[in-house]
Swiss-Prot record:
Stored CDD domains: M35_deuterolysin_like
Gene3D superfamilies recorded: 2.60.40.2970, Collagenase (Catalytic Domain) (3.40.390.10)
Keywords of this entry: Cleavage on pair of basic residues, Disulfide bond, Hydrolase, Metal-binding, Metalloprotease, Protease, Secreted, Signal, Virulence, Zinc, Zymogen
The protein's name: Neutral protease 2 homolog AFUB_100460
Organism per entry: Aspergillus fumigatus (strain CBS 144.89 / FGSC A1163 / CEA10) (Neosartorya fumigata)
Length: 355
């Protein structure tokens, strides 16, 4: 029933590229094969002005993030790396890249480290999305990026030899032993708040202001509203389970991928959610319109987990400017669209078209 609601909603809107603003600068990505599953990406500033952007969750991020999408026979290959939620201000300088007009940089990575390509054969590689622009170490906007389509013939024997970026852990418990003392208290409060906010957001998606809904999802269709409500209800249900749901929750980082810019991350392939140190510096619930807090960070991460509501979301547009520039079909598949909508409904953000 979950899949049907989302599938019918996506079929109800045009299947197309990301909605891009007029006259926007852009990054062009050229993908090429280095050796079997090892890929090189050349990132070029194709605009006329110097730009500084956040390269986390993007090319040059050393963590096993989703840099490209892989397809076999038009079906996307499951991603087995991590999806991070970043801080929106106070970004460290080492998270930023500056490119002059026409300038480039390169990144090499092995796609077999974050996807099971052991059966070999033809695989199509491509990518597109938005990357955040930074000013004064704060996310201040976005620029679109897109790549060529790269066709590979994967050698299965060589793909098997590539080590996975994420090593499996013992996941017998749902809220792990890392969640004790104050961190357990913080997590339980955050889960309760996330459940309440997601539930209210689900109601707003179903029957609230059409102008508010359109601000985030670019549609007033009943199917679209039902699909958004269904995912948010599933998130509210998961947050109410107190460890008995589909996700495994870590209050500290067992894999070593947190840094000073990452609030939390999710491993969609195993439905694991990890809080980083930065998570504990956030407010429980913010009153700032489109601000970050613990509750909506959990909402963001739970939408990534397919065990909560399949399929899990991507990070197609990060932050309010990028998320609200997405087409309907892409907003439905974007984690921050749900977190921002939930924040907007709970803190009564006033939209320009609010009715």
């Amino acid at each position: 029933m979950k899949i049907t609601a989302l599938a019918s909603a996506i079929l109800a809107v045009a299947q197309g590229a990301l909605a891009l603003p007029a006259r926007a600068p852009a990054l062009d990505i050229t993908l090429s094969q280095v050796n079997n599953t090892r890929i090189k990406a050349v990132v070029k500033n194709s605009g006329t002005e110097k730009i500084t952007f956040v390269h986390l969750n993007f090319f040059n991020d050393p963590s096993p993030v989703k840099k490209v999408s892989l397809y076999r026979n038009a079906t996307e290959v499951e991603f087995t790396g991590i999806k991070q939620r970043l801080r929106s201000d106070g970004l460290s300088n080492d998270a930023l890249t500056t490119l002059a007009p026409g300038a480039t940089y390169e990144d090499e990575f092995d796609i077999a480290s974050t996807a099971n390509l052991t059966q070999g054969g033809p695989v199509t590689v491509r990518t597109q999305g938005f990357v955040p622009i930074a000013m004064n170490n704060k996310i201040a906007g976005y620029i679109p990026y897109s790549s060529n389509e790269l066709e590979l013939e994967v050698d299965a024997e060589k793909a098997v030899a590539v080590p996975a970026s994420i090593k499996p852990l013992d996941r017998r418990t749902k809220i792990t032993s890392s969640c004790t003392g104050n961190r357990a208290t913080v997590l339980n409060t955050a889960l309760r708040n996330a459940a309440s906010i997601a539930s209210k957001a689900a109601d707003a998606a179903s029957s609230g202001s059409s102008a508010l809904f359109t601000e985030y999802f670019k549609s007033t269709s009943g199917n679209i509203r039902s699909a958004v409500a269904a995912r948010l209800k599933a998130v509210a249900s998961e947050a109410s389970m107190n460890g008995g749901g589909s996700t495994t929750y870590y209050c500290s980082d067992p894999y070593g991928y947190c840094d000073s810019n990452v609030l939390a991350y999710t491993l969609p392939s195993t439905n694991e959610v990890v809080n980083c140190e930065l998570f504990y510096t956030l407010q429980e619930v913010t009153n700032d319109c489109h601000g970050q807090d613990q509750a909506t960070t959990i909402i963001h991460e739970f939408t990534h987990a397919p065990g909560v509501y399949p399929p899990g979301t991507e990070d197609l547009g990060y932050g309010y400017s990028a998320a609200t520039a997405l087409s309907t079909s892409n907003a439905l598949n974007n984690a921050d669209s749900y977190a921002l909508f939930a924040n907007g409904t709970s803190s009564f953000c006033v939209m320009t078209a609010f009715s």
